[in-house]
Amino acid sequence: MAATAAALAVTDELALPLRAVGDLAAAAGFSREEVVVITQCASLGGKLPFDDASVGSVLAVIKKVENLGDLFITEISRVLKAGGMVLIQSSPSDQDPNNSIQRKLLLGGFVDVQASAASSQDSEHSVTIKAKKVSWSMGSSFPLKKATKGLPKIQIDDDSELIDEDSLLTEDDLKKPELPVVGDCEVGATRKACKNCTCGRAEAEEKVEKLNLTSEQINNPQSACGNCGLGDAFRCGTCPYRGLPAFKPGEKIALPGNFLAADL
C-alpha cells in the first residue's frame, strides 16, 4: 500500500460508488485517478496504512456510526496534512448522529465543522459533514506579538493661571536680617557693660545685682555665723549667699557658666 496519497476514500462497506469518489476528487481539487479507495475499513482495527501528514483529503463513507469512533477520528487526523479537508457521509437515523459526529470532529482537533446535504444521489448516504484540519503542525511554534503600552500622556492646560512665588513675599521678607554685634562693649579692667550694651552683658550684670552681693563678698566670702559656706541647707533665711554653691571662707566663689541662665 502506498505510504502517501493525494486523496483517500474509506468506507465500512464492501464497495464505494464511483460518484462518491468523484465528489471527493472535485471537492479536493484532484482527479478521480488520484484517489486511493479502502473498503471494509472496520477490519483495519482503526488504523490506516499511511504515514503521518501524507494525505491531502479524506472521504469517509460510513454506514454504521459506531464504526466512526474516537480512535478512527484520531487516525484520520494523523494521516491528514496540515490544513487538509475531511468529508464524512453517513446515513440518517432517528437518533440524529450528525451532532455526535460533529462533536467527535471538534474534540479531535478539527475546525470549520459544517453539516450539509450530500451531493450524491444515493439515498443511504444523504448527509455530509465537512471539517478541516488546523493549518499548524503538532509542536510548531510562532512568536507572539506583545502589545506595547505607552505611558499616558499628560494634558497640560496652557490657560491655567500659575502664581509667581516671589509675588507672595513682602519688602520686609526680602530684607536681610541684621545680626547683633557680639561683645560690642568697650570694657576696661572692671569689665562693666557700656551704656548702649547690645551683647547681653548688661542683662547679666543685672542678674548679679539681684543677688545683693558685692564684688568683695564674691572675691573674699566671709561668714559671721560660720554656716554660710556649708550650703543652703545650713544657711539662714537672710543669708546673702543663698542660692550659691558651698565655699570655704576666704576662697573666691566660682559661679557655674549657666548660673545666670533662666530656668525653663
Curated annotation (Swiss-Prot):
Belongs to the anamorsin family. A motif (Cx2C motif 1) lies at residues 225-228. Its cofactor is [2Fe-2S] cluster; [4Fe-4S] cluster. [4Fe-4S] cluster binds at C225, C228, C236, C239. InterPro entries: Anamorsin (IPR007785), CIAPIN1 (IPR046408), SAM-dependent_MTases_sf (IPR029063). Pfam families: CIAPIN1. This is Anamorsin homolog 2. Component of the cytosolic iron-sulfur (Fe-S) protein assembly (CIA) machinery. Required for the maturation of extramitochondrial Fe-S proteins. Part of an electron transfer chain functioning in an early step of cytosolic Fe-S biogenesis, facilitating the de novo assembly of a [4Fe-4S] cluster on the cytosolic Fe-S scaffold complex. Electrons are transferred from NADPH via a FAD- and FMN-containing diflavin oxidoreductase. Residues 1-142 are annotated as: N-terminal SAM-like domain.
